[in-house]
UniProtKB/Swiss-Prot annotation:
It catalyses: 5-amino-1-(5-phospho-beta-D-ribosyl)imidazole + S-adenosyl-L-methionine = 4-amino-2-methyl-5-(phosphooxymethyl)pyrimidine + CO + 5'-deoxyadenosine + formate + L-methionine + 3 H(+). Its EC number is 4.1.99.17. This is Phosphomethylpyrimidine synthase. NCBIfam families: PRK09284.1, PRK13352.1, thiC. GO terms for biological process: thiamine biosynthetic process; thiamine diphosphate biosynthetic process. Zn(2+) binds at residues 439, 503. Pathway: Cofactor biosynthesis; thiamine diphosphate biosynthesis. [4Fe-4S] cluster binds at residues 583, 586, 591. Gene3D superfamilies: 6.10.250.620, Radical SAM ThiC family, central domain.
């Protein structure tokens, strides 16, 4: 009976996902709409979310109230066309290839007659897979012979590409339009040596990419992506992981999770599928993704040898790279730093090697007693990646899986090797970022950032958390969010989210949202701490709305308007609760902000009476004297009328 129930539940989940993705409409957030800022070259239109705010009541009478308008607030938006009702969405067709013209105009790529990966050729010839296939497959593009088509290569030639101008506009989020002094106010941050400018220019973007301090992940076979940038001098980014396994999920569910992730703020998405139909799932995901897609190619290579790590070969892995490059994957996690001599260093760990990719390569090294073929063939991998503009995400295969193992010899030995490989990739003008831990207690986190900056020459750092304690299964989005905020403040450029299901199971749609909101909080907190220009505008706008009891604006400015509204309405569901000058926590008589407003009004009254309210002590004393005088007058009145509670009507 239980098996039947399980099957029914999985069918229902898949059916719900199908219903969602096949009936998508551009659904904006409440009181929000898409605005597009135009660039100077090649039809650049950068989408942002603009939140319309209600007016502030500033006085007047009940009959003639006086209001002051609040200017709209622009926020960074990762959702692409999925929140724009003006776009016709059809996942069977995929998204518009708006970068295609930019790629073609450079003249350094060519269209191939057909796919060149042997594995893809076999899949295409299998008619049994026709019902799963993405129908409208694009033509494959590759760099012409002898051409390097990476954004780093262009940057080092002094070329500002449309993609670079796009991200400059995107990072600034229309801040020049902000006129309110209150919204622009910001605390001075501590950036720990970062070089964050007041305003991001296309030239600054070019220079950061040329120096290797930032990456712009955009495979030429993924023209549907909206360009974004990862680097310590830019806004902190967040990655969401999706992916099926041999026991869970379907193509429909993974596409749903990708779309859902971009709605809730995923700057990139990693497809970590390990089950059946990896190739077909990835095609659907890439064709419908407005954000860069990353993968761990060794996972699929392992599937091709039936899960036997010892049977992996360079030839199988190389074909997997080409297969995924031709599909449009934007960055590859490559565990090239797991060297044979480092594996014994993990023997005394509490949790050993916890990285899937790391454990696969460690097993291969020990079985053959040879050096990691990802390391020995690293320059061959560079040659492939620069033909498609794919970024290296150098994997931390020896990351600590428990706080007991944090910052040990194995972890930092691998990190030093990743630094060497970074410089080798840069010789080929291939973009690189570095993956980091893991499980690290708070007092040991900064050492990770310092070591990474030292050995990897400021290449962007990308960490999974880190988790700051191991005692909270089911709440590891919180244990890791703490560490994520901290390491991002120190300079980590992108955070890989952790969901409540970490260590327990594959996340569902709601887990994805929970993890993303947690990590958007961590990323934003780090931007504030670094003093990133404009980071505080959203906080200021929400605080102003909160003080003025503009409840709808409070909900809509927040990261999760749905939950904020839901929590408020649990106790004050009526529409009158949305204009009330209190919430259910304090009630009408004890609301600190309501009392603060009354104090402000009282200060205005004092000014009108010629009393300086700047002297707080005098103000409080005067108010107390006024209150005491009024109370005494009422007491005298009560006594004069006979000290009776009730009186007969006259």
């Amino acid at each position: 009976m239980s098996n039947t129930a399980k099957k029914s539940s999985r069918r229902e989940t898949r059916a719900a996902a199908s219903e969602y993705i096949y009936n998508l409409t551009g659904q904006p957030f409440p009181n929000s709409h898409k605005v597009y800022v135009e660039g100077t070259q090649n039809n650049i239109r950068v989408g942002m979310r603009e939140i319309t705010l209600s007016d502030t009541y500033i006085g007047g009478s009940d009959e003639n109230p006086v209001y002051e308008p609040n200017e709209p607030l622009r926020v960074y938006d990762t959702s692409g066309p999925y929140t724009d009702p003006n776009f016709k969405l059809d996942v069977r067709q995929g998204l518009a290839k708006f970068r295609e013209q930019w790629i073609e105009s450079r003249g350094d790529t060519e269209l191939l007659e057909s796919v060149t990966s042997r594995f893809t050729q076999q899949r295409m010839a299998d008619e049994g897979l026709d019902h799963l296939r993405f129908e409208h497959l694009p033509k494959i593009r590759r760099g012409k012979a002898g051409k390097n088509v990476t954004q780093m290569h262009y940057a080092r030639q002094g070329i500002i590409t449309p993609e670079m101008e796009y991200v400059a506009i995107r990072e600034n989020m229309g801040r020049k339009k902000i006129h309110a002094e209150l919204l622009a106010a910001q605390h001075k941050g501590e950036s720990f040596g970062a070089s964050i400018p007041d305003f991001i220019t296309p030239e600054f973007v070019r220079d950061e990419i040329a120096r290797g301090r930032a990456i712009l992940p955009n495979n030429i076979n993924h023209p549907e992506t909206e360009p974004m940038i990862v680097g310590r001098n830019f806004l902190v980014k967040v990655n969401a992981n999706i992916g099926n396994s041999s026991v869970s999920s379907s193509i429909e569910e993974e596409v749903e999770k990708m779309v859902w992730s971009t709605r809730w703020g995923a700057d990139t998405v990693m497809d970590l599928s390990t089950g059946r139909y990896i190739h077909e799932t990835r095609e659907w995901v890439v064709r419908n993704s407005p954000v860069p897609i990353g993968t761990v190619p060794i996972y699929q290579a392992l599937e091709k040898v039936n899960g036997v790590a010892e049977d992996l070969t360079w030839e199988i892995f190389r074909d997997t790279l080409i297969e995924q490059a031709e599909q449009g994957v934007d960055y590859f996690t490559i565990h090239a730093g797991v060297l044979l001599r480092y594996v014994p260093m993990t023997a005394k760990r509490v949790t050993g090697i916890v990285s899937r990719g790391g454990s696969i390569m460690a097993k291969w090294c020990l079985a053959h007693h040879k050096e990691n073929f990802l390391y020995t063939h690293f320059e061959d991998i560079c040659e492939i990646l620069k033909q498609y503009d794919i970024c290296f995400s150098l994997g931390d295969g020896l990351r600590p899986g428990s706080i007991a193992d944090a910052n040990d010899e194995a972890q930092f030995s691998e990190l030093r090797t990743l630094g060497e490989l970074t410089k080798l990739a840069w010789k080929h003008d291939v973009q690189v970022f570095i993956e980091g831990p893991g499980h690290v207690p708070m007092h040991m986190i900064k050492a990770n950032m310092d070591e990474q900056l030292k050995h990897c020459d400021e290449a962007p750092f990308y960490t999974l958390g880190p988790l700051t304690t191991d005692i909270a299964p089911g709440y590891d989005h919180i244990t890791s969010g703490i560490g994520a905020a901290q390491i991002a403040w120190y300079g980590c450029a992108m955070l890989c989210y952790v969901t409540p299901k970490e260590h327990l199971g594959l996340p569902n749609k709601e887990d994805v949202k929970e993890g993303l909101i947690t990590y958007k909080i961590a990323a934003h907190a780090a931007d504030l701490a670094k003093g990133h220009p404009g980071a505080q505008e959203r906080d200021n706008a929400l605080s102003k709305a909160r003080f003025e009891f503009r409840w709808h604006d409070q909900f809509n400015i927040g990261l999760d308007p749905e939950r904020a509204r839901e929590y408020h309405d649990e106790t004050l569901p009526q529409e009158s609760g949305k204009v009330a000058h209190f919430c259910s926590m304090c009630g009408p008589k004890f609301c600190s902000m309501k009392i603060s407003q009354e104090v402000r009004e009282y200060a205005k009254d004092l000014e009108a009476r010629g009393i300086d309210p700047a002297n707080a002590a005098d103000t409080i004393t005067i108010k107390m004297i006024d209150v005491e005088a009024q109370m005494k007058a009422k007491s005298d009145e009560f006594k004069k009328t006979g000290s009776e509670i009730y009186h007969k009507a006259i």
